Protein backbone atom coordinates (compact mmCIF):
# COMPACT_ATOMS: atom_id res chain seq x y z
CA UNK A 1 0.00 0.00 0.00
CA UNK A 2 1.28 3.43 -0.90
CA UNK A 3 1.31 5.58 2.22
CA UNK A 4 2.92 8.63 0.63
CA UNK A 5 0.98 11.87 0.87
CA UNK A 6 1.21 14.97 -1.25
CA UNK A 7 3.63 17.52 0.21
CA UNK A 8 2.12 20.46 2.06
CA UNK A 9 2.39 23.83 0.31
CA UNK A 10 5.36 25.99 1.25
CA UNK A 11 4.70 29.65 2.00
CA UNK A 12 7.10 32.54 1.39
CA UNK A 13 7.18 36.23 2.30
CA UNK A 14 8.06 39.00 -0.14
CA UNK A 15 10.32 41.92 0.66
CA UNK A 16 8.64 45.27 1.48
CA UNK A 17 7.57 47.35 -1.53
CA UNK A 18 5.59 50.53 -2.07
CA UNK A 19 1.84 49.99 -1.74
CA UNK A 20 0.00 50.57 -5.05
CA UNK A 21 -3.21 51.64 -3.29
CA UNK A 22 -2.33 53.76 -0.24
CA UNK A 23 0.37 56.45 -0.56
CA UNK A 24 3.11 56.23 2.04
CA UNK A 25 2.39 52.61 2.94
CA UNK A 26 4.62 49.61 2.34
CA UNK A 27 3.24 46.22 1.36
CA UNK A 28 4.39 42.65 1.88
CA UNK A 29 2.75 39.46 0.64
CA UNK A 30 2.78 35.84 1.69
CA UNK A 31 2.54 33.45 -1.24
CA UNK A 32 2.66 29.83 -2.31
CA UNK A 33 2.68 27.89 -5.56
CA UNK A 34 -0.40 25.96 -6.71
CA UNK A 35 0.55 23.13 -9.06
CA UNK A 36 -0.45 19.53 -9.58
CA UNK A 37 -3.70 17.68 -9.12
CA UNK A 38 -4.38 19.24 -5.71
CA UNK A 39 -4.26 22.78 -7.07
CA UNK A 40 -8.06 23.20 -7.46
CA UNK A 41 -8.68 22.06 -3.89
CA UNK A 42 -5.89 24.29 -2.60
CA UNK A 43 -7.25 27.24 -4.59
CA UNK A 44 -10.64 26.75 -2.95
CA UNK A 45 -9.20 26.68 0.56
CA UNK A 46 -6.85 29.61 0.05
CA UNK A 47 -9.41 31.82 -1.69
CA UNK A 48 -11.86 31.16 1.14
CA UNK A 49 -9.03 32.17 3.48
CA UNK A 50 -8.39 35.51 1.80
CA UNK A 51 -5.82 34.63 -0.86
CA UNK A 52 -5.89 35.68 -4.52
CA UNK A 53 -4.52 33.81 -7.52
CA UNK A 54 -2.06 35.18 -10.07
CA UNK A 55 -0.94 32.51 -12.55
CA UNK A 56 0.08 29.51 -10.44
CA UNK A 57 0.70 31.61 -7.33
CA UNK A 58 -1.72 32.30 -4.48
CA UNK A 59 -0.96 35.36 -2.36
CA UNK A 60 -2.41 37.55 0.34
CA UNK A 61 -1.26 40.77 2.03
CA UNK A 62 0.99 40.38 5.06
CA UNK A 63 1.80 44.03 5.71
CA UNK A 64 3.52 44.91 8.97
CA UNK A 65 1.66 48.11 9.84
CA UNK A 66 -1.54 48.01 7.79
CA UNK A 67 -4.62 45.76 7.50
CA UNK A 68 -6.56 47.83 4.98
CA UNK A 69 -6.93 45.06 2.35
CA UNK A 70 -10.13 43.12 3.07
CA UNK A 71 -11.33 40.14 1.03
CA UNK A 72 -14.83 40.61 -0.39
CA UNK A 73 -17.38 38.13 -1.70
CA UNK A 74 -20.91 38.80 -2.94
CA UNK A 75 -23.80 36.66 -1.69
CA UNK A 76 -25.10 35.76 -5.12
CA UNK A 77 -28.36 34.08 -4.12
CA UNK A 78 -29.50 37.09 -2.08
CA UNK A 79 -28.31 39.75 -4.50
CA UNK A 80 -30.80 42.11 -6.11
CA UNK A 81 -29.55 44.84 -8.48
CA UNK A 82 -30.09 48.47 -7.58
CA UNK A 83 -31.92 50.83 -9.89
CA UNK A 84 -28.64 52.08 -11.36
CA UNK A 85 -27.45 48.50 -11.91
CA UNK A 86 -30.66 47.68 -13.74
CA UNK A 87 -29.92 50.62 -16.01
CA UNK A 88 -26.46 49.18 -16.70
CA UNK A 89 -28.02 45.83 -17.62
CA UNK A 90 -30.51 47.53 -19.93
CA UNK A 91 -27.83 49.67 -21.58
CA UNK A 92 -25.82 46.54 -22.38
CA UNK A 93 -28.64 44.42 -23.72
CA UNK A 94 -26.79 44.23 -27.04
CA UNK A 95 -23.87 42.28 -25.53
CA UNK A 96 -23.29 38.58 -26.15
CA UNK A 97 -21.11 36.75 -23.62
CA UNK A 98 -19.50 33.33 -23.99
CA UNK A 99 -17.20 31.17 -21.86
CA UNK A 100 -14.08 29.53 -23.30
CA UNK A 101 -11.03 27.58 -22.11
CA UNK A 102 -8.25 29.74 -20.66
CA UNK A 103 -6.51 30.45 -23.95
CA UNK A 104 -5.18 33.90 -24.96
CA UNK A 105 -5.77 35.58 -28.31
CA UNK A 106 -4.29 38.59 -30.08
CA UNK A 107 -7.73 40.22 -29.97
CA UNK A 108 -7.82 39.88 -26.19
CA UNK A 109 -4.30 41.26 -25.84
CA UNK A 110 -5.04 44.30 -28.02
CA UNK A 111 -8.03 45.10 -25.81
CA UNK A 112 -5.94 44.45 -22.69
CA UNK A 113 -3.28 46.90 -23.89
CA UNK A 114 -5.82 49.63 -24.64
CA UNK A 115 -7.27 49.16 -21.18
CA UNK A 116 -3.89 49.36 -19.42
CA UNK A 117 -2.69 52.31 -21.48
CA UNK A 118 -5.80 54.28 -20.56
CA UNK A 119 -6.57 53.16 -17.01
CA UNK A 120 -3.30 51.91 -15.49
CA UNK A 121 -0.41 53.68 -17.20
CA UNK A 122 1.74 53.67 -14.06
CA UNK A 123 0.56 50.37 -12.60
CA UNK A 124 2.63 47.25 -12.07
CA UNK A 125 1.10 45.61 -15.16
CA UNK A 126 1.61 48.55 -17.51
CA UNK A 127 4.58 47.02 -19.36
CA UNK A 128 3.12 43.54 -19.86
CA UNK A 129 4.03 42.03 -23.22
CA UNK A 130 1.95 39.64 -25.29
CA UNK A 131 3.94 36.79 -23.73
CA UNK A 132 3.22 38.10 -20.23
CA UNK A 133 -0.47 38.22 -21.07
CA UNK A 134 -0.40 34.67 -22.41
CA UNK A 135 1.21 33.47 -19.18
CA UNK A 136 -1.39 35.30 -17.09
CA UNK A 137 -4.15 33.43 -18.92
CA UNK A 138 -2.60 30.01 -19.50
CA UNK A 139 -0.47 29.47 -16.39
CA UNK A 140 -3.19 27.91 -14.26
CA UNK A 141 -3.64 24.51 -12.64
CA UNK A 142 -7.19 25.25 -11.46
CA UNK A 143 -10.58 25.47 -13.18
CA UNK A 144 -10.11 28.71 -15.12
CA UNK A 145 -12.17 30.12 -17.97
CA UNK A 146 -12.05 33.18 -20.23
CA UNK A 147 -15.37 34.98 -20.62
CA UNK A 148 -15.59 37.21 -23.69
CA UNK A 149 -18.14 39.98 -24.09
CA UNK A 150 -18.95 41.09 -27.63
CA UNK A 151 -21.40 43.46 -29.25
CA UNK A 152 -24.18 41.54 -30.93
CA UNK A 153 -24.15 41.61 -34.73
CA UNK A 154 -26.53 40.23 -37.31
CA UNK A 155 -26.19 36.46 -37.50
CA UNK A 156 -25.19 35.87 -33.87
CA UNK A 157 -27.11 32.94 -32.49
CA UNK A 158 -26.93 31.02 -35.74
CA UNK A 159 -23.31 29.94 -35.27
CA UNK A 160 -21.75 28.84 -31.97
CA UNK A 161 -19.24 31.71 -31.71
CA UNK A 162 -20.27 35.36 -31.57
CA UNK A 163 -18.65 37.50 -34.26
CA UNK A 164 -19.06 41.05 -33.00
CA UNK A 165 -16.22 43.24 -31.69
CA UNK A 166 -14.69 42.19 -28.37
CA UNK A 167 -15.36 44.91 -25.78
CA UNK A 168 -14.65 43.19 -22.45
CA UNK A 169 -12.97 40.07 -21.06
CA UNK A 170 -12.87 38.33 -17.68
CA UNK A 171 -10.44 35.69 -16.44
CA UNK A 172 -12.45 33.65 -13.94
CA UNK A 173 -11.86 30.67 -11.65
CA UNK A 174 -14.66 28.23 -10.89
CA UNK A 175 -14.51 26.99 -7.29
CA UNK A 176 -16.64 24.69 -5.18
CA UNK A 177 -18.49 27.61 -3.58
CA UNK A 178 -18.40 30.32 -6.22
CA UNK A 179 -16.73 32.21 -9.02
CA UNK A 180 -13.54 34.19 -8.44
CA UNK A 181 -12.91 37.12 -10.78
CA UNK A 182 -9.15 36.93 -11.22
CA UNK A 183 -8.83 39.83 -13.68
CA UNK A 184 -11.13 41.72 -16.01
CA UNK A 185 -10.68 44.50 -18.54
CA UNK A 186 -12.73 46.38 -21.09
CA UNK A 187 -12.68 48.92 -23.90
CA UNK A 188 -11.94 52.27 -22.21
CA UNK A 189 -13.64 54.10 -25.09
CA UNK A 190 -16.96 52.66 -23.90
CA UNK A 191 -16.89 54.05 -20.36
CA UNK A 192 -20.55 55.11 -20.59
CA UNK A 193 -21.53 51.42 -20.61
CA UNK A 194 -20.05 50.76 -17.12
CA UNK A 195 -18.63 47.48 -18.39
CA UNK A 196 -16.82 46.71 -15.15
CA UNK A 197 -20.13 46.78 -13.29
CA UNK A 198 -21.78 44.80 -16.07
CA UNK A 199 -19.22 41.99 -15.85
CA UNK A 200 -19.72 41.66 -12.10
CA UNK A 201 -23.49 41.51 -12.60
CA UNK A 202 -22.98 38.86 -15.26
CA UNK A 203 -20.84 36.78 -12.88
CA UNK A 204 -23.53 37.01 -10.22
CA UNK A 205 -26.03 35.68 -12.77
CA UNK A 206 -23.68 32.86 -13.75
CA UNK A 207 -23.11 31.91 -10.11
CA UNK A 208 -26.85 31.82 -9.43
CA UNK A 209 -27.52 29.65 -12.47
CA UNK A 210 -24.89 27.14 -11.29
CA UNK A 211 -26.05 27.06 -7.70
CA UNK A 212 -22.86 28.72 -6.46
CA UNK A 213 -23.36 31.01 -3.45
CA UNK A 214 -20.47 33.46 -3.89
CA UNK A 215 -18.71 35.76 -6.32
CA UNK A 216 -15.23 36.66 -5.06
CA UNK A 217 -14.06 40.17 -5.98
CA UNK A 218 -10.63 40.19 -4.38
CA UNK A 219 -9.61 42.96 -2.00
CA UNK A 220 -11.46 46.08 -0.97
CA UNK A 221 -9.19 48.81 0.37
CA UNK A 222 -10.90 51.45 2.46
CA UNK A 223 -9.67 54.88 1.38
CA UNK A 224 -8.72 53.73 -2.13
CA UNK A 225 -10.86 55.26 -4.86
CA UNK A 226 -9.89 52.39 -7.18
CA UNK A 227 -11.62 49.90 -4.89
CA UNK A 228 -14.73 51.82 -3.84
CA UNK A 229 -16.98 50.17 -6.40
CA UNK A 230 -16.70 46.76 -4.74
CA UNK A 231 -18.93 47.61 -1.77
CA UNK A 232 -21.85 48.55 -4.04
CA UNK A 233 -22.81 44.91 -4.66
CA UNK A 234 -24.91 43.95 -1.65
CA UNK A 235 -25.32 41.82 0.32
CA UNK A 236 -21.71 40.82 0.65
CA UNK A 237 -19.32 39.39 3.20
CA UNK A 238 -15.90 40.61 4.30
CA UNK A 239 -13.19 38.39 5.77
CA UNK A 240 -12.62 39.78 9.24
CA UNK A 241 -10.71 38.59 12.31
CA UNK A 242 -13.51 36.16 13.24
CA UNK A 243 -14.08 34.88 9.71
CA UNK A 244 -16.50 35.90 6.96
CA UNK A 245 -18.97 38.48 8.25
CA UNK A 246 -21.87 40.19 6.56
CA UNK A 247 -20.82 43.69 5.55
CA UNK A 248 -22.36 46.83 6.96
CA UNK A 249 -21.03 50.35 7.44
CA UNK A 250 -20.12 49.34 10.99
CA UNK A 251 -17.53 46.92 9.60
CA UNK A 252 -15.31 49.86 8.73
CA UNK A 253 -14.23 49.93 12.37
CA UNK A 254 -13.93 46.13 12.80
CA UNK A 255 -10.50 44.54 12.72
CA UNK A 256 -9.88 42.57 9.49
CA UNK A 257 -8.36 39.12 9.37
CA UNK A 258 -4.68 38.82 10.23
CA UNK A 259 -2.12 36.08 9.75
From Swiss-Prot:
It catalyses: N-terminal L-glutamyl-[protein] + L-leucyl-tRNA(Leu) = N-terminal L-leucyl-L-glutamyl-[protein] + tRNA(Leu) + H(+); N-terminal L-aspartyl-[protein] + L-leucyl-tRNA(Leu) = N-terminal L-leucyl-L-aspartyl-[protein] + tRNA(Leu) + H(+). One of its GO terms (molecular function) is arginyl-tRNA--protein transferase activity. GO terms for biological process: ubiquitin-dependent protein catabolic process via the N-end rule pathway. It is an enzyme of class 2 (transferase). Pfam families: ATE_C (PF04377), ATE_N (PF04376). Its EC number is 2.3.2.29. Its main location: cytoplasm. InterPro entries: Acyl_CoA_acyltransferase (IPR016181), Asp_Glu_LeuTrfase (IPR017138), N-end_Aminoacyl_Trfase (IPR030700), N-end_Aminoacyl_Trfase_C (IPR007472), N-end_Aminoacyl_Trfase_N (IPR007471). Keywords: Acyltransferase, Cytoplasm, Transferase. It is found in: Cytoplasm. The keyword Cytoplasm applies. GO terms for cellular component: cytoplasm. HAMAP family: Bpt. Functions in the N-end rule pathway of protein degradation where it conjugates Leu from its aminoacyl-tRNA to the N-termini of proteins containing an N-terminal aspartate or glutamate. Belongs to the R-transferase family. Bpt subfamily. This is Aspartate/glutamate leucyltransferase. The lineage of its organism: Bacteria, Pseudomonadati, Pseudomonadota, Alphaproteobacteria, Hyphomicrobiales.
Amino acid sequence: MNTQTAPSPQFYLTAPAACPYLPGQMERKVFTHMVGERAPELNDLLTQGGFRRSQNIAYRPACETCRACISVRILANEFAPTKSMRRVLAANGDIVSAEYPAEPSSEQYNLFRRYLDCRHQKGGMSDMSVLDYAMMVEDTHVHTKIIEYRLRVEGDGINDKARGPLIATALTDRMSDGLSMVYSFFDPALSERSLGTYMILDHIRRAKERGLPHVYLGYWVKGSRKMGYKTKFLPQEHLMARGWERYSVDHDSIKPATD
